[in-house]
């Protein structure tokens, strides 16, 4: 039924604020999003938002809904230098966070991320990011069973690319994902060499190496 669907799981045994009511033929609920931000050509931009989806919210034919029963708050702040300075043509830095609760008031997860990108005056390009997922609680992992606590993780990557307008250009990069309590480790390294003898022809060689444990 709709009450037992993956968007709700009203049958969860530890959810005292919701339950399956077999007499209902439809659900009622509400949802909304409020955003406040600054979007312009200025150096500093930001956005903060709150999204609410009550447990009984149902879109029906309006669109697909992955989940309900959530209160989400997120904020991002960006610093963007568009004009050349020092050795850079431009520079972009962004940091953000997300927090999720259910309608019982239980904090489900906290995520933070910082990322940057820049082009140098020699037209080389660099970007990277760092993401932290704190210890979190999932109401859906057991598909209708009780909530389960999941360990957090840290992810990061860095990429560098030479001038793409040249006939020969290259890129190197790496990714590292690490679960808390040594739950998992994943490391990947890659490089690429691209040769473009003419506009209609491009040849590339892109080996990679990964380690997982």
For every predicted segment, state its role.
Residues 2-213:
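Exposed, low-structure sequence patches enriched in small/polar residues
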